[in-house]
Amino acid sequence: MLNKRLTIQLPFYATQTASSSRFWRVLSPKSRTGIALYASLILLCIFFTIFSTMSHPSLQCFSPTSLVGAQPLKNLTHLIIVAGHAVWLGGSTNGEDDSEWILEPYQKGEGKVFAQHVRSGLDLLSQDDSSLLVFSGGQTRNGAGPSSEAQSYYSLSMQINSDEGLAARRTTEEFARDSLENVLFSVARFYEVTSRYPQKITVVSFDFKRDRFLNLHRKAIKFPEHKFHFVGIDPEGGVSDATREAERKNAIIPFTEDPYACSNPLLVKKRMERNPFRRQHSYLITCPELIPLLQYCPSDPSKFFNGKLPW
C-alpha cells in the first residue's frame, strides 16, 4: 500500500507539446541562430518604421524639392526689392491719387510716394540687364480681400511700363508681412526664379527706414555690406518728427531687441494682424539652404544668426 506510486492525471492540453517546439528542436543550432537574427531584423525594421512616421516637433512635414516650371533665369545676379506698403486698386492716375489705394489713416497723402517707389524700381531694372525686380508684400489688408500688396504693385508697374523685355524680369513675392520678410523672402523668391542667390541687393523704400534696412535687416541675413544698397524716397517735403519717432519706437528698437521678430510682442502682433487670410510661404521647400535662417529663433532673441549661408 505504501509502495503504490501516486499518479496525477493532467488535463489533455497540458500534456501536448506545441508543434512549434517540435519544429524548433529538429533545427540545427546554426539554423536557429539564423532565424533568430532574421526575426530580430524584422522587429527592428518595424520599430524604425513606426518611429520615423511619428510626429516630432523637430522634424519637417515636407521635403525640399526642385521647382518644375519654366527655365530659370540663371543670368540674373542683382535683386531689386520694392517693399510694399499698401494695395493699389487700379485707376487712371497710375497710383498718384490716394483714392486708388487702400490706405491706413496714417498713410494719407502717401499714395503718390508708393507710385514713385514702383517707378524707381522700374528705372533700376532698366539700367541693369542682370537684375530681377521683385515687388514684395503679402495679403495684408482685410479690405482688399485676398489681393497682395506685391500683385497690386506689379499691376501698377505694368500699367506704367509694359515693355516686354522688362516684364520678363519682374515678379512678385506675396507672403512678406514686415520689412525683414520683404528682404529675406525676396531673396528666396530670387532663388526660385533664377536657381541662384543674388550677388547684389538694392532695396527701394521710404528713406526714413534706411537705418532699419541697412543696419538691422541686412545684418540679420548676413549679406555683405558693400553689396547691399538702398534707395530711399520720402514724401515731398520730408517726414515729420512724429514719423521718425514712430520709426524708432515701433521698428528700430523692437528689431534691435529681436532681429527676427520671434518674441517681441509688437512685432509678433503685427505679423498676425498682417496675415488675415492665413497664408504660408513655401520657401522652406524651394530654398533648402535657407531653412536654418528662415526658422531661426534663438533663446536669446537679440542674437544674430551665425550659421553658413550661400552668399
UniProtKB/Swiss-Prot annotation:
Places the protein is found: Membrane
GO annotations of cellular component type: cytoplasm; cytosol; membrane; nucleus
Membrane topology category: Multi-pass membrane protein
Alphabetical keyword list: Membrane, Transmembrane, Transmembrane helix
Transmembrane segments: 34-54, 76-96
GO terms, molecular function: catalytic activity
PANTHER family documented for this protein: TRANSMEMBRANE PROTEIN (PTHR28110:SF1)
Stated family: To yeast YOR238w.
Annotated protein name in UniProt: Uncharacterized protein C57A10.07
Organism: Schizosaccharomyces pombe (strain 972 / ATCC 24843)
